[in-house]
């Protein structure tokens, strides 16, 4: 079967990066783009649409849905602009939400024993748009934006008029044809979901980052009742998702900095440690056979002992860059490099 989805539109040039997730008889797919953000569920056997949640209160996000079981009830949890949301998998109804997150979420949460853990890093929306578009080569650096400037940043592909109607026209409060200051927040954030720092915050404080734990389950707004802890830290990453096991939340920051937090309190279990492979990281850590595997953008795969203390077991150079997170299945480690897919296993499995 095949289901056609709306063609996603992104002002920034990262493009789509979301993957489908399987849950029982459903295929789940969340696509938070700049035009028609939505969460879809399809029947696995036929492709027939089961439900759809139009996430019009979301900006662009890249977080994937995860299943969280609390007291025998499954919720499909999605992290997005301003909110962590728990969905009823059968109907697509938003069962609960916690207003805890930032503007643009690229990391994916982890659910362990009914608790959802996430690490996030994001700047305020006004500052992002000014810094990225007005200060770009195509911008005029006057501290404000007009439609022509946004179109020049995007390039030759025409921006859908529906995008400008949804954002620019809403934010241009004085109707002077420009977005400036608070108008940027109004344009690119839903009126019921003002997430992240306001345009008045500049410098280092314009970007927030923290680790967070939220108890799953509940109904309605659970912000006050279900947030277990939330701690600011300089050691999160805006792309790499955490690994959680045995009371430890393991983080890797771009540049090769590793921090481990206590899942009960959110406090660091040890000081930040520079990994044996520095440089860029896009892939998230994975665990198998008592080891943690960290794939670096430079092609080195670092192998650590799965323990509270840092112990490096090996470093393997695969010869070309790695962006994708490795996968573990059937006793094998699968790694996608720039031009290859590798299967690494031991014993009979390797044959």
Predicted regions and their residues:
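Noncatalytic, solvent-exposed loop/strand surfaces
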Residues: 1-351
């Amino acid at each position: 079967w095949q289901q056609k989805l709306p063609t996603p539109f992104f002002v920034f040039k990262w493009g789509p990066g979301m993957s489908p997730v399987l849950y029982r008889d459903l295929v789940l797919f969340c696509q938070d783009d700049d035009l028609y953000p939505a969460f879809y569920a399809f029947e696995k056997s036929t492709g027939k649409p089961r439900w759809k949640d139009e996430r019009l209160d979301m900006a662009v996000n890249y977080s994937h849905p995860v299943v969280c079981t609390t007291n025998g009830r499954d919720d499909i949890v999605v992290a997005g602009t301003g909110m962590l949301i728990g969905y009823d998998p059968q109907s697509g109804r938003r069962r609960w939400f916690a207003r805890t997150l930032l503007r643009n979420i690229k990391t994916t949460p982890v659910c362990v024993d009914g608790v959802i853990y996430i690490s996030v890093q994001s700047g305020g929306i006004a500052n992002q748009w000014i810094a990225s578009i007005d200060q770009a080569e195509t911008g005029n650096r006057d501290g404000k934006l007009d439609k022509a400037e946004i179109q020049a940043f995007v390039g030759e592909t025409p921006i859908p008029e529906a995008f400008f109607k949804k954002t620019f026209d809403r934010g241009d409060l004085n109707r002077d044809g420009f977005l400036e200051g608070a108008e940027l927040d109004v344009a690119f954030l839903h009126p019921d979901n003002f997430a992240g720092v306001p345009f008045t915050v500049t410098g280092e404080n314009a970007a927030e980052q923290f680790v967070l734990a939220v108890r799953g389950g509940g109904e309605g707004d659970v912000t006050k009742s279900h947030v277990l802890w939330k701690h600011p830290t300089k050691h999160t990453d805006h792309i790499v998702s955490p690994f959680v096991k045995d009371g430890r939340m393991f983080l890797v920051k771009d540049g090769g900095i590793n921090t481990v937090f206590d899942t009960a309190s959110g406090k660091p279990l040890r000081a930040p440690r520079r990994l044996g492979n520095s440089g860029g990281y896009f892939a998230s850590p994975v665990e198998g056979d008592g080891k943690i595997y960290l794939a670096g953008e430079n092609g080195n795969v670092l192998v650590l002992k799965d323990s509270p203390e840092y112990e490096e077991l090996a470093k393997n150079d695969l010869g070309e860059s790695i962006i994708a997170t490795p996968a573990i299945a059937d006793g094998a480690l699968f790694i996608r490099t720039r031009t290859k897919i590798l299967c690494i296993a031991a014993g009979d499995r390797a044959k």
